[in-house]
Amino acid sequence: MRKLLFAAAILASVSARAQTASIPTNLNEATVVQLQSMMASGQLTSVRLTQYYIDRIIGLDQNGPGVNAVMELNPDALAIAKSLDMERAKGTVRGPMHGIPVLLKDNIDTGDKMQTSAGSFALVGTPAPRDSTVAANLRAAGAVILGKTNLSEWANFRSFESVSGWSGRGGQTNNPYGIDRNPCGSSSGSGAAASANFATVSFGSETDGSIVCPGNANGVVALKPTVGLTSRAGVVPISHTQDTVGPHARTVADAAVALSVAQSAKFDGRDPATGGVPLGWQGTGKTRPKVPSDYTQFLDPHGLQGKVLGITRQGLNGFDPFVPTPVPVMDAIEAAFQKLTDAGATLVDLDALGYNFAGGPGEFLVLVFEFRIDVAKYFATRPAGSVPVAQGTLQTAFDFNNAHADVEMPFFNQDLWAFTLSLAPGPDDPQPAFGGLTYNQALELDRQFAIQNVDAALTAQHLDAIVTATDNPAWSTDLVFGDHFIFGTSSIAAGEGYPIIQVPAGMVFGVPLGISFFGTAFSEPTLITLASGYEAATQVRANNLPTFAATVPFTNIQGTTVTPPHRRAAPPTVKPSRVPKHL
């Protein structure tokens, strides 16, 4: 299946070879500003740039080391690039993303010839009928949507034992810094593709960690926006309370450009969150501010000078006392923290002051309760008969997986979905699995967590942001026992819908380690300033590019590394009786 998906794009690229023989060789790691300068001066065209990325994907993703990050190439990408070049030749440049190729996670709808499947054959068939708002915003800004990236199937929300970066449709994505290592998830392909220079920027989605963890694992900048800053319309959901769409990029500047273009600065009627505030601000009297149109104005190479940051080390020693964080990793984290003070920031120890950053205690109930409802609403946007779960429910998808277990469940099951389907249906119904807690009570717990900890610390300690390590370095991919998380900190901002920016901060045994800056809702300008200051002071990414080689293990838990990467060649044959009817 994946070979066929690439065939059309490869054939199209061959016809353009004569025109692309003089592609510049200095495009690896090139930034948006550099590429625009080259196109403005005539040194480069969008067609040549698009061809460069296609060639790189063919050589390093589908062949060679086999990163396996790109699910599908857009067969119209070169034609779109040519049209944008013609616009430029006539004097029209839509903005900083004009002619710039981008990749989108395979849960973000594009109303073109590409599938939007969330990595599952249950959503393969007729492509989505229209663009997601994010895709539409990118197209309007002149971006070339180059293709779709692989992901942890259903955004890592199907099994308690899932493997990050694996989907039935896409197989296993691998880490450019170590092909034996995991790219984290669920925006696995997005993070790996940005790191491997398969596009200028890529976009993923996050509910809790799915943008920032791949950023950490793959050594790129990852920007998780405030919930409602980017529209979720046309994005396969988990939770309307927590879902958000954001960029992976190789520099903070490119992430800032990407956010400027992708955001919904005005209300999007397809997503009510774009007109309101996230959970953490609800009931506080705080209102949605006017958001900047250009986030690059907040870039500052001295952005840490004079700033006050609250630091927390909660959880960094590991979730499991029997699998502590290795000493070299902790040493690298402390070295990364030291760079903050070296660059002029003052650190306030929030742990000593008694704040709690374990995450909202009601989060999991909120996620499983909303998923069943929200995914059915998404299925309703797919016309009857267009894909196996069109007009269906979570039960429809559950049944599809059982009928096609050979391709959908060769390594792990759907116990998380079974648990979700067992919940009581009402928002005020007590949930026995959660000690009688109701959905509405869980929402309030998460809201209070934000007020009493994140926002309280920011205000009382006069902080510019909160900072900590993002996640443990990438582990060896293990399709038998699943992911080997030691720690992760994204829950600090997940339940309440607050933003995070993750930036590369160090290397451990050849794989990246990052730190994350957290703030209250709509604090992206401050976070971008801080991250750009850290990036300028450390240059971790610039001095440590991916090697596409195997690496040295950093824990004694390795499991099974799959080499070459597991892939699937063809979709299952769907029996007519399994195609959902219009409900």
Name each model-derived stretch.
Residues 98-118, 298, 303-317, 368-452, ...:
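Short helix-loop capping/hinge segments that flank enzyme active sites or metal/cofactor-binding pockets
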Residues 167, 211, 217-236, 502-506:
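Flexible glycine/proline-rich, aromatic-decorated loop/lid segments
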Residues 2-83, 89, 316, 325, ...:
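An N-terminal boundary/leader segment
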Residues 118-125, 320-327, 475-483:
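Glycine/threonine-rich flexible loop motifs
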Residues 20-208, 226, 250-253, 262, ...:
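Gly/Ser-rich catalytic/binding loops embedded in alpha/beta enzyme cores
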Residues 42, 99, 140, 199, ...:
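Glycine-rich, small-residue loops and helix-cap segments
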Residues 224-331, 354-357, 538-566:
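A short helix-breaking turn/cap at a secondary-structure junction
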Residues 50, 82, 294, 300, ...:
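Acyltransferase
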